[in-house]
Curated annotation (Swiss-Prot):
Species assigned in the record: Gibberella zeae (strain ATCC MYA-4620 / CBS 123657 / FGSC 9075 / NRRL 31084 / PH-1)
Name under which the protein is recorded: Dolichyl pyrophosphate Glc1Man9GlcNAc2 alpha-1,3-glucosyltransferase
Topological domains annotated Cytoplasmic: 26-103, 150-179, 243-252, 341-355, 405, 468-472
Purpose: Dolichyl pyrophosphate Glc1Man9GlcNAc2 alpha-1,3-glucosyltransferase that operates in the biosynthetic pathway of dolichol-linked oligosaccharides, the glycan precursors employed in protein asparagine (N)-glycosylation. The assembly of dolichol-linked oligosaccharides begins on the cytosolic side of the endoplasmic reticulum membrane and finishes in its lumen. The sequential addition of sugars to dolichol pyrophosphate produces dolichol-linked oligosaccharides containing fourteen sugars, including two GlcNAcs, nine mannoses and three glucoses.
Residue ranges annotated as Lumenal topological domain: 1-4, 125-128, 201-221, 276-319, 377-383, 427-446, 494-501
Length: 501
């Protein structure tokens, strides 16, 4: 290990100390969501967990996460008994705040463990690069903003994902990798978007013979099938016994939401929505029809309120077909070339597809792309060229989550320092590729990062100084649309890299 880098444990310890200082910071409604889930799982019997609706923040994660909240609730009630009362809505005593913030830091140790495993199992010549990647993830601005200020438990669950991905590097651990991922699906169903890559990789590398795709390894297939069945049985079995599966699924998959969230996630539909806003002013001059009712909604993506004034409406089916198509394309290569690097690339592209074309995507889901991609970003300079605009766009797109003045210097300074330190380090560590570099991608990456600096300055500071509270949607629209260009450009660039590697 290079003496120039602190160890992962040392870094995690310093990061935890910094996160403790953020305990009094802004917290979103997600804080009350998780407090309410503590109360539901502590105060009510199992059969009422997915029925209870005293609060609007009903339990809508899979059963393993509910069991996780149940375990936390046993400690929470010792810290502050009022914290775990269902009727005690919007309760946020200092004991509650400190307990919930601490639980995020402690459970993030799963991510530290997974990243340490990633370092230790990396080839010796790649150990220094693996160390740098691990540090970049544990210090991720995304996790700091989403988990430790806004409030969620992504570090814990991405730790499970990273462990599964790392174990997949060893043929002897493929079964463990698949079972850990199955357990992850029972914690949070958003990871279903990555499941196609797992299915193809485990089918090809574990269930079929390496010599012939027509020879099935029956024992491996049985072990994998029984293991996954046991995990899903442990998660959903009790609710199936109570005939609550339809109710549970209605909580997990609510389809009444609109195409875009209130703040457009930086994906294809953000660009589509932006184009529609521009066409509202152009269409009358061209003689195009304008949907007058859609003009009533300046911010799109409110529940059940996604309407376009000029462009055609987008249906959930359209989103599903596009997502599936752009996932299947890289899976074809994975099936015929089932290496670990190709697998991580396919997982990354599945994350891209679901984020770019999915229905009602949240900006926080960008971590589905960034974290898997990080594991292979230093494979060579071509990979890094596609990765750079992704992290710039992805992390900047999270800024609107923290809209209070006190958090402005934290999110901007921390993110900019992270980008400068790690993108410079990555540039020094990424080896040259044996394939020619993509000129347009290199220029796009450099130009995109350069333009992002004044954009951040305007959207985060100058707009408010110039216009005050007027035109508040403009910086959000600019941020969403510009970061969408970065994510889409990164995706196109990585698709080229993936298929020519």
């Amino acid at each position: 290990m290079s003496e120039h880098y602190p160890t992962l444990a040392q870094t995690a310890l310093v990061a935890a100390a910094f996160k403790i200082l953020l305990f009094p910071a802004y917290k979103s409604t997600d804080f009350e969501v998780h407090r309410n889930w503590l109360a539901i799982t502590n105060s009510l019997p199992l059969e009422k967990w997915y029925v209870e609706k005293t609060s609007e923040w009903t339990l809508d994660y899979p059963p393993f996460f509910a069991y996780f909240e149940w375990i936390l609730a046993h400690v929470a009630r010792l810290v502050d008994p009022l914290m775990v009362k269902v009727y005690n809505l919007d309760y946020d005593s200092w004991q509650t705040v400190y307990f919930q913030r601490t639980s995020v830091i402690v459970t993030e140790l799963v991510l530290v463990w997974a990243l340490q495993t990633f370092i230790e199992t990396a080839p010796l010549k790649s150990r220094r690069a693996a160390q740098t990647v691990a540090l970049s993830i544990i210090l991720s601005p995304g996790l700091l903003i989403i988990d430790h200020i806004h409030f969620q438990y992504n570090g814990f669950m991405y730790g499970i994902l990273v462990m599964s991905l790392v174990l997949a590097r060893q043929n002897s651990e493929l079964l463990s990798s698949g079972l850990i991922f199955a357990a992850l699906l029972c914690f949070k169903h958003i990871y279903l978007y990555l499941a196609p890559a797992y299915f193809v990789y485990l089918l090809r590398a574990y269930c079929l013979s390496s010599k012939s795709i027509f020879r099935i390894r029956f024992l491996n297939s049985i072990k994998l099938g029984l293991g996954i069945g046991a995990i899903f049985g442990a998660a959903f079995g009790p609710f199936a016994a109570m005939d609550q599966i339809p109710q549970l699924l209605s909580r997990l998959f609510p389809f009444s939401r609109g195409l875009c969230h209130a703040y457009w996630a930086p994906n294809v539909w953000a660009l589509y929505s932006f184009a529609d806003r521009i066409l509202i002013h152009v269409a009358p001059r061209l003689g195009w029809a304008v949907n007058k009712s859609a003009l009533q909604s300046v911010t799109r993506g409110l529940v059940g309120d996604t309407a376009f004034a000029v462009l055609p409406e987008i249906s959930p089916r359209t989103c599903f077909v596009l997502t599936l198509f752009f996932q299947v394309v890289p899976l074809i290569k994975l099936f015929f070339q089932p290496t670990w690097e190709t697998f991580i690339g396919a997982v990354t592209l599945c994350g891209y597809s679901s984020f770019l074309f999915g229905w009602h995507v949240h900006e926080k889901a960008i971590l589905l792309v960034i974290i898997p991609f990080s594991l292979i970003a230093l494979r060579d300079r071509r990979h890094l060229g596609a990765f750079r605009p992704l992290v710039v766009a992805g992390y900047v797109s999270l800024f609107p989550l923290l809209f209070t003045p006190a958090e402005f210097p934290i999110k901007t300074i921390y993110t900019i320092v992270w980008l400068v330190v790690f993108l410079l380090a990555f540039g020094r560590l990424a080896p040259a590729s044996n394939k020619p570099r993509i000129f347009l991608l290199d220029r796009f990456s450099t130009l995109y990062i350069a333009i992002s600096i004044p954009l951040i300055l305007y959207c985060s500071l100058l707009h408010h100084l110039i216009f005050g509270k007027a035109y508040e949607f403009i910086p959000l629209m600019f941020t969403s649309s510009y970061t969408a260009i970065g994510v889409v450009g990164s995706w196109v660039g990585y698709m080229v890299v993936y298929f020519t590697a």
